[in-house]
Amino acid sequence: MSSTKKPLVLTILDGYGHREEQQDNAILNAKTPVMDVLWQQQPHTLIAASGLDVGLPDGQMGNSEVGHVNLGAGRIVYQDLTRLDKEIKEGDFFTNPTLTAAVDNAVKTGKAVHIMGLLSAGGVHSHEDHIMAMVELAAKRGATAIYLHAFLDGRDTPPRSAESSLKRFTAKFAELGNGRIASIIGRYYAMDRDNRWDRVQLAYDLLTQAKGEFTADNAVAGLQAAYARGENDEFVKPTVIQATGEADAAMNEGDTLIFMNFRADRARQITRTFVNAEFDGFKRDKVVNFGDFIMLTEYAADIKVACAYPPASLTNTFGEWLMKHDKTQLRISETEKYAHVTFFYNGGVEEPFKGEDRILINSPKVATYDLQPEMSSAELTEKLVSAIGSGKYDVIICNYPNGDMVGHTGDYDAAVKAVETLDNCIEQVVAAVKAADGQLLITADHGNAEQMRDPATGQAHTAHTSLPVPLIYVGNKAVKAVEGGKLSDIAPTMLSLMEMEIPQEMTGKPLFIVE
């Protein structure tokens, strides 16, 4: 049948970095006969997935959002972190019209300025330097009640590393003589992205009503009490910070709320609980009518609140270019990485392109993925293999979340099991691609599972790495690999393998040359 398509499949193994040392390396120590043979026998190279190569500051570890934006754009996309660092350094942040108007409004009406966000130097969802700049902006413009609601990390940072950040902000508020840390809570609750509304409700009640399971006189004492209960930063239970005699810092009508996370995927849910009139994820005991709610960057097109830094639009991303050339494409992943192969890969475009189908596989409902390291990979592989053999698609883009999601738990044995599960999946994908006479690229968006312990601290290493990632070609063409690539070279590589023109906006270079 002449209309049967021979697909080009891009398989992204999330968190699957390349590291030569075996110590604490869940990828190298796992039994991976399939990937081993592919690496030995197929054209392959290593590509950069962090720092300046993906538009992040030099040395900054890569992450899934940044990785997928670069994969889909075919050019280095300067990330919000880099953009905001530059704005603060050059002083423009302090005159941002959206932020200054929101603070001025609170000052004029005698209301509080609430600042919330992930208090972390991780630089993945936020950066504490940006939060510090926001505190300074509010104080400079005359805000007299400044409340910081700190979401704690321990995922993109070491599991117990929040104390220095809390001390830094406590000292800043003391220096200003104004404002305080009003609450602390782990990101597990405040930044869920998987519709676990019971978690989000705990964060919402803490923020709106100053209602939490625990109370402490100061943030460091609250954190130390959480550690004594066995909670790492990520899992710190809702804790109200309020010294004897202090008024509570609940959010009230007319207050200003500024959300300082710059990454969208884990900011959306809690934002919707504040701003959606029809929100029904849980019963909100208190609905606050804010004077201003500001999101630092755009979390979703349908969230209709002011945005301090709207997105710069990307034209002729890989998905859009396929649409313009009447090609069909499929995006497929589990819940945890679905936004990455759709919204982020498409350069921040929410709606599918014409000819773009999407398949969402539900991630398992477990507390943490070390409890089910295989996640939903069996169902994902079954659907992927079926799509490869369907003859419907020119291109299929798939993300397997296991390496990253299990890597984040810090559980080495579970990460090994996750990697071994992936090897079995890849075997099935390779067979399906060969049967369809298609082409397959296997890569990753960033590293994680190859470094499961921090050699400096001895703690579990739950964060991403700055290491390179593999790129392997399997298919019906004789190709030669080019060295020195990066994630933004993948889209031009794919267009080249499809013998399509590469748009001028894509500055990446093909990494496999047809011989």
From Swiss-Prot:
Monomer. Its cofactor is Mn(2+). It comes from the Bacteria. The keyword Manganese applies. Its EC number is 5.4.2.12. It comes from Yersinia pestis. This is 2,3-bisphosphoglycerate-independent phosphoglycerate mutase. The lineage of its organism: Bacteria, Pseudomonadati, Pseudomonadota, Gammaproteobacteria, Enterobacterales. One of its GO terms (cellular component) is cytosol. Pathway: Carbohydrate degradation; glycolysis; pyruvate from D-glyceraldehyde 3-phosphate: step 3/5. Binds 2 manganese ions per subunit. The keyword Transmembrane does not apply.
